[in-house]
Amino acid sequence: MAATFYGVGSIALAMHEDDEEEGSGRVFGFAAGDLVRPAVVTQQLFPMTAAAAAVVPESTEQRHVAAAAEQWARPPSRKTRRGPRSRSSQYRGVTFYRRTGRWESHIWDCGKQVYLGGFDTAQAAARAYDQAAIKFRGVEADINFTLDDYKEDIKKMNNFSKEEFVQVLRRQGAGFVRGSSRFRGVTLHKCGKWEARIGQLMGKKYVYLGLYDTEMEAAKAYDKAAIKCCGKEAVTNFDTQAYEDELNLQSWDSELDLELSLGCSGGERAAGEVLHSAPSNQRTSLTFMLPEEEEMTACHRQRSIWARPSLAPAMPDGGAVIRPDQHQHHPSSRNMLLMSQVISSSGGGGGSGRQGAAELHMRPRHGWSSGGNNWAPPYAARPRLPGAEDDEDDDSAAAASSGFPMGQVATASSPSRPSSSSCSSRRSSTAAATATTGR
């Protein structure tokens, strides 16, 4: 006997083939009523249990909950004082800044971001960006509104340069005017006058510029201060060309003062300036002399220009020089002979003798037997040649030029005691040399 199973829903029917004709059937061994075979039978080979069907919706819900938890668990963005904007705009080149509370417009030009101003509404900032984009990039630039809205503005902007047009846009912004004035950097003081001040200068919050009777004067004072600080790129209330004459005049005055100060610094000596120096004072002083004094000074220069007090160490008896090492050093006979030849070759006359003494004084001092230091040699007296007359003037000029006292010159030149007439002439020459040096 064969049995046939029919599945209807979740109920399985078992019928014997012998009972098919009779129309009777059994369900799990129990007798059932007349059953009619359905036209279409759907069979499920691996039916899903109730427990598995309950697990599926729970896993889907868990996925959604986990994704939502991950989204909420992300760390919030760091907020700084001047950090990212709290709200972005739908317009191109417009940004809302929480710190200022305004919609600010910027445009990029040649790799630099140009500030166009702050506005109360996003639409006003977007229009400022559109005008700047048309000015910088032409009518084919990407703008927020249609090009027909700016037909009149295009005609006006052709008369301005880029810098001037940016200043015009900034003046139209809401952030340009502060306080109770319609000008930038100007406020009404409680005393009734208009106060001008400029902000963010040299690390200070603002710099006070003064009080003015009218609003226009205060605005001009602010413009001048802004131009001095920022140059041509400064944002001013009025056109910068109105201040060109005044700024050029101030720069010319400063250059003139600089030239005068440099001229007084003594780069080149002017005509008529005489330099006086003393052994005890190394400072240099410049004085102007009258024509009469210049003539007298020229005469003194011709007579005893090289006369000055002696700074060389005193020479003891015997023609020796005492150095700082407390040893006596004698010049060689060859050097003494050379110096005597120079003096004698200069001539027997008074003028030629003085010239030779001056040349001897200006020559470099060399040839000491020991050491290597260029100490001033003792005065080498001119030897008395037979048949030659003694010239007291030549001796006094040579002694004054050498820088040694007159007594030592007399001792070196003649062992005998000098006469009274020679002493008086020497005293007079020494007094004249001292007077010339004092001048």
Swiss-Prot record:
Keywords: DNA-binding, Nucleus, Repeat, Transcription, Transcription regulation. GO terms for cellular component: nucleus. The keyword Repeat applies. It is found in: Nucleus. Residues 67-88, 363-439 are annotated as: Disordered. Residues 90-146, 182-239 bind DNA. A motif (EAR) lies at residues 258-262. InterPro entries: AP2/ERF_dom (IPR001471), AP2/ERF_dom_sf (IPR036955), DNA-bd_dom_sf (IPR016177). A motif (Nuclear localization signal) lies at residues 78-87. Coiled coil: none annotated. GO terms for molecular function: DNA binding; DNA-binding transcription factor activity. SUPFAM superfamilies: DNA-binding domain (SSF54171). Induction: Target of miR172 microRNA mediated cleavage, particularly during floral organ development. GO terms for biological process: regulation of flower development; regulation of seed development. Residues 410-439 have a biased composition (Low complexity). Residues 76-85 have a biased composition (Basic residues). Pfam families: AP2 (PF00847). Belongs to the AP2/ERF transcription factor family. AP2 subfamily. Probable transcription factor. Involved in spikelet transition. Prevents lemma and palea elongation as well as grain growth. May form homodimer. This is APETALA2-like protein 4.
